[in-house]
Amino acid sequence: MSKVSQPRFHLAFPVTDLEQARSFYCDVIGCSAGRESDRWIDFDFFGHQLVAHLVDPADHPFAATNAVDGHAVPASHFGVILDWSQHEIFVARLKAAAVEFVIKPYLRFEGRKGEQVTLFVRDPSNNYLEFKAFRDIEMLFDKDIDNY
């Protein structure tokens, strides 16, 4: 039995069409597909395991939003934190694929110690994803919200 050197995150989420999910996560986001059945597909999402489970569209949850920095941020979302330079490359990849941004790439908390770039997209099943990068990754879990 092999040891896992770094814990891996696992997330299972609903999709309404597996082939659309495969196209979005592999061709647009850059994931590779792993195991699959006629009801689910595993994706390697930046080294973490996503599992897209096929559901009836009527059973897919509605996403509520929360106001953050003047934007209606989907309360239910997932994503990854990239290096600053990787984020710029990733934005270019999304633009080249003509992905519609739910929240266009922008600089949040500009000039403050928590400065970050962020964007939101939606997959074909209306699952929301956030991709962001911190100017200083040490601020990821900083508790000083007043000076963030």
Where are these regions (language model features)?
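Short, flexible, solvent-exposed loop/turn segments with mixed acidic/basic and small polar residues
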Residues: 1-2, 66-70
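A generic structural signal for short beta-strands and their flanking turns/coil linkers
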Residues: 7, 39, 48, 74-76, ...
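A short, acidic/glycine-rich surface segment
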Residues: 59-66, 104, 108-112, 139-140
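Core segments of cupin and vicinal oxygen chelate
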Residues: 13-59, 146
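N-terminal beta-strand motif that seeds the catalytic metal site of vicinal oxygen chelate
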Residues: 1-20, 77-78, 82, 133-148
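Vicinal oxygen chelate
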Residues: 18-19, 73-125
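Conserved catalytic-core motifs of GNAT/GCN5-like acyltransferases
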Residues: 32-38, 106-109, 133-138
